[in-house]
Amino acid sequence: SITRRSALIGTAGLLAQPALVAPLHAKPMPPAPTVWPQALQVPGGVARLPLGPAATRPVAQVRQGEVDVPLRVVGDAIGWTAIVGIPLAAAPGDAFISVLPEGGGSPRLVHYSVAPKQYKEQHLKVSPRTVDLSPEDQARYERERDHQAQVMATFTEQPAGVALASLRMRVPVPGRRSSSFGLRRVFNGQPRNPHSGMDIAAATGTPIVAPLPGRVIDVGDYFFNGGTVWLDHGQGLLTMYCHLSSMDVRVGDVLQAGDAFCKVGATGRVTGPHLHWGVMLNRTMVD
């Protein structure tokens, strides 16, 4: 089980630091352990919500559209905490999660507040066919979008076969951070979806390693993302690796932290070779 010394740390923004923004309506936090995920309650950030003591890990969920999405809950019987990814499209203001009672009945609501954040804009020049899609490319994109939505819905307890002793992430590839999370993207003068990960510039063929133990849940070649691998690290914590030149794993393979499993490339919609690294919590890309 995850101990109170566990960390959720990554160069994609999930850094072990004291909470920066405390929930407005949640009860006071239990005594802080040595490390915690950074709590920054803004669109694209992470909320850290105390659930109180319980003999077993509570079941918590958040409403996304018409779906109740399960949440990552860490801690022990002394005090549990829900780690909530906040969508980039989240409106500032009050938000809440639901905690399901063990014996049934009405869920308990835990409220928190989302503060506004303005992300910068980035203008890029790419191949026109990746901006103004042909009917064939549009149909391909829609098929791939639906497939990856199923991948992103993955929620397992121990995908690597054992509980993680630590969630401390390592950098998957050395290199310069060439593009940040949340940038409002403008391709060839046309606004598109915000950037949902971190870009790390590196030469084609540079090995990429797993930041945590996990299981491969998807390997594919996609229109926008190019060569892509998804890893499942448990309880809705997924990582994504895009624009790859080679993918040396298959679905179901189990990786340990530091295992090389793919290589940097320039496939899909890109301006040059790099790794697009995404981190997802509760089906939400986070910084």
Put a short name on every predicted segment.
Residues 21-26:
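Boundary at the C-terminal end of the N-terminal hydrophobic targeting segment
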Residues 170-287:
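Catalytic cores of peptidoglycan-degrading enzymes
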